[in-house]
Swiss-Prot record:
It catalyses: RNA(n) + a ribonucleoside 5'-triphosphate = RNA(n+1) + diphosphate. It comes from the Eukaryota. This is DNA-directed RNA polymerase subunit alpha. DNA-dependent RNA polymerase catalyzes the transcription of DNA into RNA using the four ribonucleoside triphosphates as substrates. GO terms for biological process: DNA-templated transcription. The N-terminal domain is essential for RNAP assembly and basal transcription, whereas the C-terminal domain is involved in interaction with transcriptional regulators and with upstream promoter elements. It is an enzyme of class 2 (transferase). Residues 239-315 are annotated as: Alpha C-terminal domain (alpha-CTD). Belongs to the RNA polymerase alpha chain family.
Length: 315
């Protein structure tokens, strides 16, 4: 088993919603760097769970193409600001947040009223500017999910007063990786994986990598216990069952049935040991009876008898 170390060599906050971390994974066997790096990158960007505002109901507003009295931003601008808000939900159930504020003031996420299960990551994120004596009142839905959720038009039609928002659930916004060769003292060649991760602050760098690894483990774990059926054995079992079927199941005429019985042909297995030519050699078994047997085998069991005798070699 490959033994390697994972080390965070750099961590910094580039902005309130953009945090950076750089990790080094080494030593890896040749070829493992790109395998691990590419797999982690894909999972970090698409499968790490996050939280987002998915819909909002604004007092006095029934569609997104309008303005709000006393508010600097129109509805579309407000929806965009809500879309970019970073928060974290500790429950899988949808939650409702609220805001009711009177101006004049600048509204930030610090003004939100949230349930105890939801945490605002950046309390200074800007939301809107409200004029003096104007009131901004709204409710918004908070949900957990993965990736990017585009507005569902059917769901929009069923929503009452709520304006849907394209939700960005991804806590990891960008991932880069590089692979370098390293040379050990014994001249052995190994690889070093350099992983760069940009996050929105709702998940720690350690948690993001840990969650990504967990997703990959769950994805590949079933392959450890996979059972491949032996198709040859199953085919043989099917053939054995067919061979044991009595010729009565073919529902032949009395003449054809009696001729086969006198020839010691009692089952489909016995019948499969003869060809069409050999059928005609049975006493009192004519062309009509042979055709009846051939057609019954094909129609009921999908089996065709060979036309001519086969040379059977004895060892």
């Amino acid at each position: 088993m490959t033994q390697f170390q994972i080390e965070c060599v750099e961590s910094k906050v580039e902005s309130s919603c953009n945090q950076y971390g750089r990790f080094i994974v080494e030593p890896l066997e040749p070829g493992q760097g790109i395998t691990i790096g590419n797999s982690l990158r894909r999972v970090l960007l698409s499968d790490i769970e996050g939280s987002a505002i998915t819909a909002v109901r604004i007092a006095g507003v029934n569609h997104e193409f309008c303005s709000i009295p006393g508010v600097k931003e129109d509805v579309l601008e407000l929806l965009l600001n809500l879309k970019n808000i970073v928060l974290k939900s500790y429950t899988n159930e949808p939650q409702i947040g609220r805001l009711k504020i009177q101006g004049a003031c600048k509204v930030t996420t610090a003004n939100f009223e949230l349930p105890s299960e939801v945490e605002i990551i950046h309390g200074t994120q800007y939301v809107a500017t409200v004029a003096e004596n104007a009131i901004l009142e709204m409710e918004f839905k908070i949900e957990k999910g993965r990736g990017y959720k585009i507005i569902d038009k059917k769901q929009t039609e069923n929503s009452i007063d709520f304006l849907p928002i394209d939700a960005i659930f991804m806590p990891v916004r960008k991932v880069n990786y590089m692979v370098e060769e390293i040379f050990l003292r014994n001249s052995e060649i190994k690889e070093r994986l350099i992983l760069e991760i940009w996050r929105n602050g709702s998940v720690t760098p350690q948690d993001s990598i840990s969650q990504a690894a967990e997703v990959l483990l769950n994805l590949f774990n079933p392959f450890k216990k996979i059972n491949f059926e032996n198709t040859d054995d199953s085919t043989e079992q099917t053939e054995d069952k067919i061979s044991q079927i009595p010729i009565e199941e073919l529902q032949l005429s009395v003449r054809a049935y009696n001729c086969l019985k006198r020839a010691q042909i009692h089952s489909i297995g016995d019948l499969l040991n003869v060809s069409q030519e050999e059928l005609l050699e049975i006493r009192n078994f004519g062309q009509k009876s042979a055709k009846e047997v051939i057609d019954a085998l094909q129609k009921r069991l999908g089996i065709s008898l060979p036309k001519r005798k086969t040379n059977k070699k004895e060892n």
